[in-house]
Amino acid sequence: MNGNVLFEIKDLQKKFGSLTVFDGLSETICKGDVVVIIGPSGGGKSTFIRCLNLLEQPTAGKIYFEGEDITAKGFDVNRHRQKVGMVFQQFNLFNNLTVLENITISLTKVKKQSEEESKEKALKLLKRVGLEDKANAYPFQLSGGQKQRIAIVRALAMEPDVLLFDEPTSALDPEMV
């Protein structure tokens, strides 16, 4: 296997009951690749990327990440998710937390960073996307594009090796493109 290979997908299948979402899907994704999955609604695009982050378990086939079989029994899913970040279609921000808390919670709980270090990192990233003034706002006070940028910042704060986006153009702010 090439040392630059991040994902190797072999003969992947996903079924929901009698509905086959995809079957025989094989692909190799290398470090530095930008991959876009295009297809009709209901075609399995979201399901596929959810399989890459193990939010969905494939029905059959194998997924290797950095040479390790992530579909194997006993695989450490939490360790994998620290390396493979995801920005969800609905952004999945915690409505009861401020923007700053949405970003820092995983840094303090998962990465065990101090509150101060987490806050500093979050504010730096918020500044990069032009939302430092929204640090104390709640998700309901934000536009769709702002929520999307917060979700991206939250994912980037974890410093993943790979970042998966579900419907990345769904809430683009024209002024940010």
Language-model segments: residues:
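ABC family nucleotide-binding domain
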Residues: 4-177
